[in-house]
């Protein structure tokens, strides 16, 4: 072998040994996990079926708390309801940091309410929660907006006259319009060209973030960022969305009336003006843009995708659909709109919606957290800034809380008397949770209350007016998602809405 080749190999081996020795794992007492390779981490343990499948397999060997090296960085995985709640609720402050999502980090850069950390996050979170509540989070004003959108949807579905259609677009329209009315102060017609482009960007971006390519990027972003891939299209899409938001902000500035704020953007602009003399204020243009993008994106895709899964499940299990419609007929009838007050009188319908969220498992791997200080957890010392992934799928499919964790069965949310039964394992959107309008956990999804209202009112409004059918027999309907990464993308399907 040539001396130059031997020298190169020796230098490479020495470099890899230095990397292994200097690994941050030595700074703490991390949970057990598979032995990593220098630079590659645990790539060899990653199943082609996706990151979630790999993590579930590793849990069987290492338990509910284990370490996986995503490329060169150690990440602690939390599995099971009790483990997740012990960390993110029992030690909420320590686990309240936000970890990095590599495919969107170049856009957000720790700005905005979802990806911010420290005092910036606390300030933006307080402001956003208060503002969303002022504009009716869980109150009548948002209920009326959802009811209005539900009626627009019903009229649109009547036009189909029972012909098969793909519901993806319409479900995006209704959920996007609700969040648009709160954030931008307006709703769009379903034929509006700008609106259609925004919806296309949302769907494509969520699909790309959930792709296998993006999962690989999370492992080796430091290297792969220099090459073409899904991450570049994601950044391009997010920039186009930001361009639209920027134009909207400028229109708001030109028409702002301080005595009558119209929406989230107006209230933020007023706060910016109030604190413009404060050099350390977090109310600046960058945080406004990223907060609006976060609310806009999450407020559209999570609810619309849940509805998409929900009606596929209604086609798969027609006996469930019939029971929901029977309850709708008994409680609401056919001559008035469903209201949020109806929910407490409709435990079966509410249980079905809960089970749709649980079974569809939309965000199987929760958005990463980060410990804000050196943290002792279950005998392990996690150094400050250690990333932590809550595997929400392991809670939603937890056999300690659900008798049939891998089956669709709404009865799992009903007690012996037929009343709705709440479960601590029900964590469909985030590691926060709402019980009787009280949040549990620090990183609760800001729009969760709105999403709950949307799902109930849209779901019952549709089944009040339509029966659903498919040309595919229920037993042949495939529930396998198209993509399953950070999020799940349901399969496309055709559905007939038949007027009742």
UniProtKB/Swiss-Prot annotation:
One of its GO terms (molecular function) is iron ion binding. Its cofactor is heme. It is found in: Endoplasmic reticulum membrane; Microsome membrane. It is an enzyme of class 1 (oxidoreductase). It is a peripheral membrane protein. The keyword Endoplasmic reticulum applies. The keyword Heme applies. Induction: Up-regulated by cannabidiol. GO terms for cellular component: endoplasmic reticulum membrane. Heme binds at residue 445. It catalyses: an organic molecule + reduced [NADPH--hemoprotein reductase] + O2 = an alcohol + oxidized [NADPH--hemoprotein reductase] + H2O + H(+). The modification Phosphoserine is found at residue 128. InterPro entries: Cyt_P450, Cyt_P450_E_grp-I, Cyt_P450_E_grp-I_CYP2B-like, Cyt_P450_sf, Cytochrome_P450_fam2. Its EC number is 1.14.14.1. Its main location: endoplasmic reticulum. One of its GO terms (biological process) is response to bacterium. Keywords: Endoplasmic reticulum, Heme, Iron, Membrane, Metal-binding, Microsome, Monooxygenase, Oxidoreductase, Phosphoprotein. Belongs to the cytochrome P450 family. Cytochromes P450 are a group of heme-thiolate monooxygenases. In liver microsomes, this enzyme is involved in an NADPH-dependent electron transport pathway. It oxidizes a variety of structurally unrelated compounds, including steroids, fatty acids, and xenobiotics. This is Cytochrome P450 2B10. The lineage of its organism: Eukaryota, Metazoa, Chordata, Craniata, Vertebrata. The gene is Cyp2b10.
